[in-house]
């Protein structure tokens, strides 16, 4: 039995295909979803989406949103998303280093919050790449 997974951003469809299982980062932690999962609607955190096809796992960096799960259908609407295989490792590492530097230079509450969010997004992109190679 399979699940139909659809990952959408406001601009495009990132993924629309059948999968065996997913592991999703929510605001209350990670959840695993298998066929016949109980219906749920949840907020999606900045984090990694792991997708199992057959014996192969793929990763995707999600930048926050929400998910609806029910009747073996999973719809994830996020601000932005990238497949781990589409992320340039050098660019992601460079973005992470810039985000770390910006956080150390942040002045005031607003700059600190924005720098922390940028750092979380950058770390998620690097984690999506590293999860592929492990």
UniProtKB/Swiss-Prot annotation:
Designated gene of the protein: atpE
Major place of residence: plastid
GO biological process: proton motive force-driven ATP synthesis
Organism for this UniProt entry: Amborella trichopoda
Membrane topology: Peripheral membrane protein
Protein name stated in the entry: ATP synthase epsilon chain, chloroplastic
Protein role: Produces ATP from ADP in the presence of a proton gradient across the membrane.
GO molecular function: ATP binding; proton-transporting ATP synthase activity, rotational mechanism
Keyword list, A-Z: ATP synthesis, CF(1), Chloroplast, Hydrogen ion transport, Ion transport, Membrane, Plastid, Thylakoid, Transport
Protein family according to the UniProt entry: Belongs to the ATPase epsilon chain family.
Subunit text: F-type ATPases have 2 components, CF(1) - the catalytic core - and CF(0) - the membrane proton channel. CF(1) has five subunits: alpha(3), beta(3), gamma(1), delta(1), epsilon(1). CF(0) has three main subunits: a, b and c.
NCBIfam families: ATP_synt_epsi (TIGR01216)
Localization in the cell: Plastid, Chloroplast thylakoid membrane
Cellular component GO terms, alphabetical: chloroplast thylakoid membrane; proton-transporting ATP synthase complex
Pfam family, one: ATP-synt_DE
């Amino acid at each position: 039995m399979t699940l139909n997974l659809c990952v959408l951003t406001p601009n495009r469809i990132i993924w629309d295909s059948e999968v065996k299982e997913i592991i999703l980062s929510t605001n209350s932690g990670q959840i695993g979803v298998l066929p016949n999962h109980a219906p749920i609607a949840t907020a999606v955190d900045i984090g990694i989406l792991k997708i199992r096809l057959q014996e192969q796992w793929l990763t995707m960096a999600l930048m926050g949103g929400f998910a609806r799960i029910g009747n073996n259908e999973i719809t994830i609407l996020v601000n932005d998303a990238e497949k781990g295989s589409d992320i340039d490792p050098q660019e992601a590492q460079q973005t992470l280093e810039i985000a770390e530097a910006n956080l150390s230079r942040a002045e005031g509450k607003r700059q600190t919050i924005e720098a922390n969010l940028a750092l979380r997004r950058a770390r998620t992109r690097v984690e999506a790449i590293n999860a592929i190679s492990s």
